Amino acid sequence: MKKHIAAGWRYVRYGRIVLGWIVMSTFLLGFLGVVNASALARWQLLPALLAGNVLAVTVLVLLTLCFGRVYCSVLCPLGLWQDFVSYLAERRKGGRRRYAYRQESWKLRYGVLAVLASGLLGGAAAIPLLLDPYTIFGRIATHLFAPAIHSGANQLIRWQIAYDGPDLGLAHTDVVTFGTTAVLVAAAYLIVISLVAWRYGRLYCQAFCPVGTLLGTVSRHAVLQLHFGTDCISCGLCAKSCPSSCIDVPHHRIDASRCIDCFTCVSVCPKGALAFGRPSKETITTSNAGSTQNLPNASRQPGESDNPNQPNAAPSLTRRQMIAGSALATLAAAGALTKGARGTALAAAPEKVVRPPGALSYATFSERCTGCHLCVASCPQGILRPANLEYGLGGIFQPRLDFTDGYCDPACTRCSDICPAGAITPVAPEKKKTLKIGTALYRPDTCVILTEGRTCGHCAEVCPIHAIEMADDGNGHLLPKVHHRRCIGYGSCEYHCPAQPKAIRVAGKEEQTIVQTNGQFGRGKK
């Protein structure tokens, strides 16, 4: 009977793994530009909080209250990546389990959460940019995985052509990189998190991830939890298989705030002594207070192991610590919600930086954007770039428009359609054609008409809004004249300008507004 129970939980575990692979693959394909992963991205906790996505936040909290940290188990792409690395490590070690119980790093966990809360409440946009797990995975996928996969696919196409191989159904894709800084930072995150996962499993999730701590605080009160039964023989297989290192076998205690419901422990238990359900009051007391009731050598002192080689387990959190942690988690969540709602920033918009169409207010954009780079990876024109210090230190890695290699198509609304945090609000195609995101500024000192005596007028020819005309300067030269009120700033003029440095450049606006085009909209020349 016990073997049947273990086998049943093994299928549950496999189902969790399959679902996790589907989620991570969908995210990866989304950052590759193959599928639209925006619907799934909107269920990521911190972006949902910043966007004021009440439905997503409510569902995630209720799921956690009912079942524990299932979000971390099947919805968080960074957590799923750590599971993959842990699996590779186990195969490398011949399938040998290598985990051991670790005491909760309460001060570290809630210290990181306090940093996030202070950043959200204080307007320090760089804090969520650096700490959100979904955002970290997004940058890794955009700047490391996507270029590597595209390069590999292009190489397969070259081999197919060279050796007259079968048609693989692949199309050549330009490999786009978005700057050395973004690549190096993404690589640093990938290396550190992967090394930690290789050796310690989900240690990052249990000690450093603020989303994990936030949900872990809720998970302490989950209705259904993993708990010990009366048939435990203290073999320790469950603790050795737990990637969260949250199972204290000598004290028959499972830390619900760190358990991610992977169900590995239940599937390996030879006696079926672990159960997932509503624990009894006695079990809750044992879990929360470190009681030795129903344990071997029940006369020992709390926190003392019957194995002399086993370090003494730390007592569980005091009531005061639990209240303080819950208050801090509530403060962080409230900070994210109010930050996304109020749309105020500490500084004015940086001059000349052009934001994506739909980032109507610089204040709202800077406070909601987590820099996940889903828009950067999905831009068909490839003109969205992660900022370095163009927005200041607080806006590092937030997207900006760069017209060096292209211009913004007035008919394209991809970035506003997929933003999960509400930093780029949805813009209808017809509305976008009149949405002013910047203004073209003409610099005659670098214009080839004056510096080289050439006949030019590319900027006027390609302007889709006909906001540039060629006018006589009184000296026999036809020079560009920009009608600033009509210009919408989509960069076609800057991209096509032959001068170096550019004689016409687009400067961004603090507030994106609708302009009157008088029905003169046209695509202009390519």
Predicted regions and their residues:
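Non-ligating segments of multi-cofactor redox enzymes
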Residues: 1-252, 257-258, 263-526
